[in-house]
């Protein structure tokens, strides 16, 4: 019995120690405590067992509360604790009673005279007590351990199940984590590749461009090779065709039975080669000749181009001067309209008359009602500017002409006004109408006589000059190429001076005779002076004024002589007595002479009073003679005009005509040489024939005065003709 209980206890202890180490520790402690204190072993063991169970329940509850959903140990421990409490409450008084009994038994005094109890009996008694106690304890433990073991096994199974679930979940999570890591690595690799591709993009593009360049170079090389091969193929094809042709020709020759012998063929071949060489030499010579001709023609063309350019520049400058002169003419017309009051009144009276013939107004006929002052002024300006352009321009650079003398291109103005002249019949009708009007007009005051004389004289001269417009226009047309082509020939002035010196010696004595003749006429007029008024004195005061003329030659400056220029008094009358001439150079004063008083005829007095008179009487007046002297170069230009019925004489001597003839011949020779040099001998012959005809006609006509000084506005005149040589224009007179 004891052994069984011990074995049971040992087994229970072993089971409890396996599953619950805390209980094993508690039991070991209890056993040790029981051995130490065997008297109080039962109580202590019970109390310790109960405490151990309670502690186990607490620890088990604390351990399993986190893992298990259903905690069976709590119910089990609660029941166990209630039973244990009840047992302890029931066993406490029993234990206390036993202890008291033992204590009382130990304290009871043994009788002194009694014998002690033997030890064997004491041991037997103790063993019986211990066995009884063990039995009770074993019973109690059987029920408790059975319950505890069942609950613990159930709990262990549940925990194992949960552990297996947790292991499965852990394995699944580990597998999933592994897959996620692999996926992350793949993603990282892809991202790295993308970033690297972005960073290496310029390198990739550069590589691509290099590849493209290389491919293009290869393509170009391949194309060049293909072209070369195709070229070679074409060449070979051509050679093949040529060889085939040669082969066919040779076959035909070999098949030809009428072929000559070899010697004859060689002779023919040598002849043909010699001919070919000769032809080649001829071709080379012709090519050389062609090159030489081209060079010569190119040089000639360059010369002609230079000439044409010079002519164009000359024409442009002349046109500019013409425009300036036209502007000056307009200004002079305005001045005349303002100052010539008497002429305006005459025009108004002419407009009021009904019997005045209605004729179309022109710019060059002074009988026109509206353009009388302007036309006279234009002819006056042409008289002032009849010197060629290239002469005046060269002299202007040397400083021997005043700055106001700009009359250089009137050669272009001449055809402009001459082309608009009316016919002879119209001029005659106008002349007759004007005579009738003048006869019917009342006599004006004496102070207006000079102006009327000038107007009527200019009108008569213009009526006669209108009949010869054709010859004058031809002369001006022949003069234009000379004016345009003389500009680039300034270096030849020395030759021109020699030509000037080559003028016949008859000119000088004739000039002296003409001057003596003029002096004689002036003295005769002084003897006939008697009834002239203050107007006559003022009108003829300019006849005594002498102007120093400078004869300027290229390379020398010498004063050669002086000439008289009458007619300056009209300019002083028009612009006022106190106004000095504009073109007088500073430092060159006038040679003052005492005034001469003249007497006039009845015709001149009638003209002073505004009455009409015959043309002979008018022309014999000193005013008309002065007009003739101032417009001498204009009259020399008009020497070529054909004779007409109206020929006023101004007393020009034979010396003046001889001098004009000499100048005309010199000019004609110079002109013919220039024309022959420029345009050939044929053109020069035609020009010479036309000039000779004009000169042959010129002696038949009397000297014609120009209408340019009709209103007395000229301040400086040129003492040479426009038909003279270019060096003749070097002689100038300054007022």
From Swiss-Prot:
Matching InterPro entries: Lebercilin-like, Lebercilin_dom
Cystines in this chain: none
Domain of life of the organism encoding this protein: Eukaryota
Keyword vocabulary terms for this entry: Coiled coil
Polar residues bias spans: 689-707
Biased segments, Basic and acidic residues type: 487-525, 542-553, 573-588, 632-641
Family classification: Belongs to the LCA5 family.
Protein's name in the database: Lebercilin-like protein
Ranges of Low complexity composition bias in the record: 43-53, 528-541
Region span, Disordered: 12-54, 91-115, 356-379, 473-597, 632-657, 685-735
Coiled-coil stretches noted in the UniProt entry, renumbered to this chain: 205-335
Entry-linked Pfam families: Lebercilin (PF15619)
